UniProtKB/Swiss-Prot annotation:
Name of the encoding gene: fusA
Name of this protein: Elongation factor G
Family matches, as HAMAP family: EF_G_EF_2_B (MF_00054_B)
Gene3D superfamilies named among the record's database cross-references: 3.30.230.10, 3.30.70.240, Elongation Factor G (Translational Gtpase), domain 3, P-loop containing nucleotide triphosphate hydrolases, Translation factors
Upper classification of the organism: Bacteria, Bacillati, Mycoplasmatota, Mollicutes, Entomoplasmatales
PANTHER family referenced in this protein's UniProt entry, alphabetically: RIBOSOME-RELEASING FACTOR 2, MITOCHONDRIAL, TRANSLATION ELONGATION FACTOR G-RELATED
Originating species: Mesoplasma florum (strain ATCC 33453 / NBRC 100688 / NCTC 11704 / L1) (Acholeplasma florum)
CDD domains according to UniProt: EF-G (cd01886), EFG_III (cd16262), EFG_mtEFG1_IV (cd01434), EFG_mtEFG_C (cd03713), EFG_mtEFG_II (cd04088)
């Protein structure tokens, strides 16, 4: 079956924003205009097409990235709708990894908000080209120029408007296109019929100034045009579009559009901008990977190259079972064929291939380079795994996910719930790499850990709804960590003789702090003093030992371990003995390494009316918070600070009470830092160590 849409006419894009910027409504309008839905669902009515999980419809927020395929003016869009709540940044992270471009939606009244900064940073990490849609221009207090300025001020990004709104708030009626210097007025109906009008006289001067600034900014990305511009020649409209496109594709320049998705104004022009400025799979750099021999290699967006893809999301569908979402980077995949999971070394059969519209499924025969689809039948594939043609092995760059910062204990309500709970938790952990579950060895309780209170609320809710498991939930606890402050060298020896075959394991390991780099293992054993299989066993044993720190039993992080020596016994050596020996070496070394407890520190931004500014500053300081600065926004103040997570439980209620419900805050994980002695002593006391 031949490809229906060329690669040039394909766009893989994400819609990203702060919670409540109107992102899901914008996506709804896009799906309406691209012919995917025939009745628009409003988020505040709980009827949105993309928010298809029951919890999303109740809470009016987007939790999982629903992937959908849509069509616009002979172009195919694969759209990923991503969540705007900080507890779900993993969803944003994994979407950005497989996208070629994104639309960042801002609230026209607030401009750049804290979660916008987080998502923007993630997009910058993956060098994702972006265009910006300033939404809610009909809202009281909407200010387009302020919003554009906030992109430069708060994100340090080079942005310029390519549109100018006509009016604002209730008087927002249309848009001036600064590239073509045309003005449009909207009728406000769902079809978004735009009538071309004269540029209003009171905006003509401003539009001309903004256009000349746009031309000046855009020609920087095209040398030939720069020369033409400096020679005083006229830059044509196609040339200007080409220069803007170059700047966008390089993730260096960010054009800004205006509109109101809810009031049906400006979304069709946004779709045109996606085609004009965001890249096709051919415009972005080829994906890199590693061959079995360790050499670096690339895969290009080409149907004739060997098949390679990255699994970026796993979820359980009530009708078809396990669904694995994947992005094809090269080649073609046909349903019913076998693929190699090169990350795990497993061969798997792709039963069916589905293209998704929110949670509706269309079965397709083949999927091509540059496409996004979901596979049924992959049993062992998880997020971040590479899928390839088994004759052409490669492992593509994977994804890195943050550690959970909050945990709580779960107890099943009945015996029947207990039997189902284990299965439910393992399925949910398979879907979400930032969700962990384990059994506390001392209490026997089941512990779940995640990125925030809302994250864990939704996990518990999903267990009840999807798996019919009722649980009692304990109070949230902070996920502390441990680390070392000094280097040390230690020997670990495990020898057991009990008649017949014994056990023998012996290693010498050098440990040192590895700040912010996680666990690192280095093998410096020479001359075959310890065989490779026993060295690997020592590594596994050490990693297991690190999950239970010596200070208070919390996982130890940021440790570099170098195995430098050891010995073997011809008969008695076995893998288990080396696992135990490595754990002994760690225990011995910890006596000299000054192990300490780390606590999660959060970036906290509080926005309050001016009259509460002093109260909030005092309150944050009383929570061991470090105030980093404040910013005036209208008649409100935004205070930026870093506060230990343990001090932030119940803060929503606290803030509500002393600001009469007029304050709000956002909290995002920043880093782990050493806990003060008094706090550490309290933690150790509670742990019973």
């Amino acid at each position: 079956m031949p490809r229906e849409f060329s690669l040039e006419n394909t766009r893989n894009l994400g819609i990203m924003a702060h919670i409540d910027a109107g992102k899901t409504t914008t996506t709804e309008r896009i799906l309406f205009h691209t012919g995917k839905i025939h009745k628009i669902g409003e988020t505040h009515e709980g009827a949105s097409q993309m928010d298809w999980m029951a919890q999303e419809q109740e809470r009016g927020i987007t939790i999982t990235s629903a992937a959908t395929t849509a069509f616009w003016k002979n172009n195919r869009f694969n759209i990923i709708d991503t969540p705007g709540h900080v507890d779900f940044t993993v969803e944003v992270e994994r979407s950005l990894r497989v996208l070629d471009g994104a639309v960042a939606v801002l609230d026209g009244q607030s401009g750049v908000e804290p979660q916008t900064e987080t998502v923007w940073r993630q997009a910058t990490t993956y060098r994702v080209p972006r265009i910006v849609f300033v939404n809610k221009m009909d809202k009281t207090g909407a200010d387009f120029i302020y919003s554009v300025k906030s992109i430069g001020d708060r994100l340090g990004a080079k942005a310029a408007p390519i549109q100018l709104p006509i009016g604002a708030e209730d008087n927002f009626t249309g848009i001036i296109d600064l590239v073509e210097m045309k003005a449009y007025e909207f009728d406000g109906k769902a079809e978004e019929i735009a009538k071309e009008i004269e540029i209003p006289a009171d905006l003509k001067d401003q539009a001309e100034i903004l256009r000349s600034e746009l031309v000046e900014a855009a020609v920087e990305y095209d040398e030939e045009l720069m020369m033409k511009f400096l020679d005083g020649e006229e830059i044509t409209i196609p040339e200007l579009k080409q220069a803007i496109r170059k700047g966008v594709i390089g993730a260096e320049f960010f054009p800004v559009l205006a509109g109101s998705a809810f009031k049906n104004k400006g979304v069709k022009l946004l779709l045109d901008a996606v085609v004009d400025y965001l890249p096709s799979p051919l415009d972005v750099p080829s994906i890199k990977g590693v061959l079995p021999n360790g050499e670096e290699a690339e895969r290009h967006a080409d149907d004739n190259e060997p098949f390679s893809a990255l699994a970026f999301k796993v979820m359980t569908d009530p009708f078809v079972g396990k669904l694995t979402f994947f992005r094809v980077y090269s080649g073609i995949l046909t349903k019913g064929s076998y693929v190699l999971n090169s990350t795990k070394g497993d061969k798997e059969r792709v039963g069916r291939i589905l293209q998704m519209h929110a949670n509706n499924r269309n079965e397709i025969e083949e999927v091509y380079a540059g496409d996004i689809a979901a596979a049924v039948g992959l049993k062992n594939t998880t997020t971040g795994d590479t899928l390839v043609d088994e004759k052409h092995e490669i492992i593509l760059e994977s994804m890195v996910f943050p550690e959970p910062v909050i945990q709580l204990a779960l107890e099943p309500k009945t015996k029947a719930d207990q039997e189902k709970m284990g299965l439910a938790l393992s399925k949910l952990a398979e879907e979400d790499p930032t969700f962990r579950t384990y059994t506390d060895e001392e209490t026997g309780q089941t512990i779940i850990a995640g990125m925030g209170e809302l994250h864990l609320d939704i996990i518990v809710d999903r267990m009840r709804r999807e798996f019919k498991v009722e649980t009692n939930v304990g109070a949230p606890q902070v996920s502390y960590r441990e680390t070392i402050k000094l280097p040390a060298k230690a020997e670990g020896k495990y020898v057991k003789q009990s008649g017949g075959r014994g056990s023998y394991g012996h290693v010498v390991i050098e440990f040192e702090p590895n700040v912010d780099k996680g666990f690192e293992w280095v093998d410096k054993i020479t001359g075959g003093r310890v065989s490779k299989e026993y060295i690997n066993a020592a590594r596994v044993g050490l990693e297991n030992a690190l999950t239970n720190g010596v200070v208070a039993g919390y996982p130890m992080i940021d440790v570099k371990a170098t195995i430098v020596d050891g010995s073997m016994h011809d008969v008695d050596s076995n893998e288990m003995a080396y696992k135990i020996a490595a754990s002994f070496a760690l225990k011995e070394a910890c006596k000299k390494m000054n192990p300490v407890i780390l606590e999660p520190i959060m970036n906290v931004e509080v926005t309050v009316p001016d009259e509460y500014y002093g109260d909030v500053m005092g309150n944050i300081s009383s929570k061991r918070g470090l105030i980093e600065g404040s910013e005036q926004r209208g008649n409100a103040q935004t205070i930026k600070s870093k506060v230990p997570l343990t001090e932030m439980f119940g803060y929503a209620t606290e803030l509500r009470s002393f600001t009469q419900g007029r304050g709000n805050y956002t909290m995002i994980f920043s880093h782990y830092a050493e806990a003060p002695r008094s706090i550490a002593e309290e933690i150790i006391k509670k742990s019973g160590k």
